[in-house]
Structures are given as C-alpha cells and as structure tokens.
Amino acid sequence: VGGGINTLEDFDRVLKCGADKVSVNSGALRDPGLIPAAAQKYGDQCVVLSADVKRVNGQFRVFAKGGREDTGRDALDWISWCVAHGAGEICLNSIDTDGVRTGFDLEMLDAVAARVNVPIIASGGAGKKEDFLELFHHKGIDAGLAAGIFHQKLLTIHDLKTYLNENGVEMRL
C-alpha cells in the first residue's frame, strides 16, 4: 500500500488494515528518518521505497509530487542510502518511459541493481507482452508493474501470464 505515507502513524494505519508492505516516496523525501524508523519498528521487509526517477543532463535524478518536482537528488545515491537505512525493496518508476510503451528502462534498472541487493520492482514503459519477457529474463529485476497497458485493454493479465509462463517465466496462473 502506498500514497500519502508520511509518518509512522500512516504505516500503523495501513498495516492495521491488512497491508504486508508499505510504499513510501514523497514522505521519505521530506523526512528521510522515516525509512530507518519504519524499518526498526516493522522490519525492513515491510518498507518499500518508491522512487520516481528521470534523467536530467545524463544523471538519474529523484522526482517528487508525482514526477512534477525535481528534488536535485542523485537517484542512485538516494536509493542506496535508503536501502542502507532500512528499505527492504525498491519500486522504481522511470518517468522517462512511463506511459510511452517502448519497454522498461533497462539502463536505469541496471544502474540501480548494481548498487543495491534488495528486490527491485520495475515500473514504467510496458507496451507489449514481449517487454515483460525481456524484463523477467533481465538479471537483477524481481518484478514488473504496469497499469495503462491493462486499463486501455491492450493486453489482459491472463494473456500476459499465459505468454510469460509459456516462455519460461514461472508464476501462478
């Protein structure tokens, strides 16, 4: 569960409603101490850092407020710091590829995977089922996230899962 997570009380609220993991983005940017505090209280497996990342002058930068505000932070440094301080998983959204349907940003994903050793969920860029197959055969990436491709009925979840399973990606059908 994510969105509007700014305090430990917000973690409490969603966990009491049944969430297993809590995703934090802007709340951690405003108060970086939220990551270690939440990890200490609930365990790092519960703390998911969500990062909206975009290239600015060749550098991966962290953005806030739904990708509208450049924080000036280097994304690789920020993500590494958060993992070192208790983020047990990363949800990495590429602003550059989000909604474009040209495939996941493998260069960005590789750069992050080289710096951390926690699960990475890739988000942004899926346009066809082959994009997911490429992602899931890519070293260091644990999961993929997509929305528009399903909302706009370009692909069904069932068809995607069947295709991936037929191509060697094990999953629950």
Q: What name fits each language-model region?
A:
Residues 1-5, 26, 51-53, 94, ...:
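A cross-domain feature marking catalytic cores of carbohydrate-active enzymes
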